[in-house]
């Protein structure tokens, strides 16, 4: 996320905090990362009731190494873009989303994407259509489906 003490970030991080148990229930860990220092994270935590709800790790990237590695660093501003990355157990990025700095992300949708990524990892011959939810029908790609959807 771009930075501590701004406007959209606390709403996103609180949204994740509210669903943290659901992410853990599906075997997913959350890490929030900004280019701030851990001292700034601590000050923000102490000052904000929203941030005090957070139980997941808040990582500091003051050298911008992680932001650069994920290709979300904005050199001119010294901050990261607003990005979410789903990394599978093998360490491969299987889904990502990068939003404009003034548009917040949705934790419910991120959880749905995590579950969809887990489903297709377990069922390699099936895909999850738009708005797929756990338990809903999936698709099995085949020549028979071409032009039928």
PLM region spans:
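Chalcogenol-based redox active-site neighborhoods
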Residues: 1-149
């Amino acid at each position: 996320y771009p930075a501590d003490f701004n406007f959209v970030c606390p709403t996103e991080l609180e949204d994740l905090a509210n669903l943290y148990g659901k992410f853990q229930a599906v075997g997913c860990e959350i890490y929030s990362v900004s280019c701030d220092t851990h001292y700034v994270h601590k000050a923000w935590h102490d000052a904000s009731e929203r941030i005090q709800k957070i139980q997941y790790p808040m990582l500091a990237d003051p050298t911008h190494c992680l932001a650069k590695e994920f290709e979300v660093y904005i050199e001119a501003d010294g901050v990261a873009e607003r990005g979410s990355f789903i990394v599978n157990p093998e360490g491969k990025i299987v889904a990502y989303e990068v939003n404009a700095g003034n548009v917040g992300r949705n934790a419910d949708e991120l959880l749905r994407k995590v579950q969809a990524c887990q489903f297709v990892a377990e069922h390699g011959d099936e895909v999850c259509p738009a708005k797929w939810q756990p338990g809903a029908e999936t698709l099995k790609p085949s020549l028979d489906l071409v032009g039928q959807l």
